[in-house]
Amino acid sequence: MSRSINGVSAASCIIAAMAGTPVWSSTAATNLQVAGTGTDLQNDAIVHSKKATPDGEIDESTEIVELRGQLNGKVLYHVTTVIDRKKGTLVNTGDQVFSGTIAGSAPVMLHDGAFHFEVNLSTGTDTGSVHLTDHIAGPRVRCELSVNGTGNDASGNPTFAYVGTCTFDEGIS
């Protein structure tokens, strides 16, 4: 006699574990709390333009961000940076694409055209939000993340921690 819970038997768990496949899968949406760290490889940025403004400058660049933790992969980050020295702020907006895995999922690609990061130039406090909601490839998933700066690595690249929720439309596969 074979026993299973929600269609998952002990034998299927063992086979999936040997194959390195996540065991949990369902047809219902699955919410997953995620956390990890990242590094903005700012030292290797391609600066496309710099424009002086009365209060600072506006830069457009392309950068790569490395993510570790439950989101594991790279982000191609096309960013517009507005530096306002009167307000003492640096604000990043633009478009970014994440390519990688989420909690061991199959590879995904997700776009975010609504991210927002803000740095207080006086204190160095760095906070932001990420909205990886536009599916490009892989499992249907979307992630909403909060980001907090943690300083710089030995090369001077900004580092950060992220937390949030990823929702897989049809379970994690």
What are these regions (language model features)?
Residues 1-11:
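Bacterial N-terminal signal peptides that target proteins for export
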Residues 6, 15-16, 103:
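Residues marking helix boundaries in flexible regions
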Residues 11-21:
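Bacterial N-terminal signal peptides
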Residues 24-173:
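Beta-strand-enriched cores of mature, soluble protein domains
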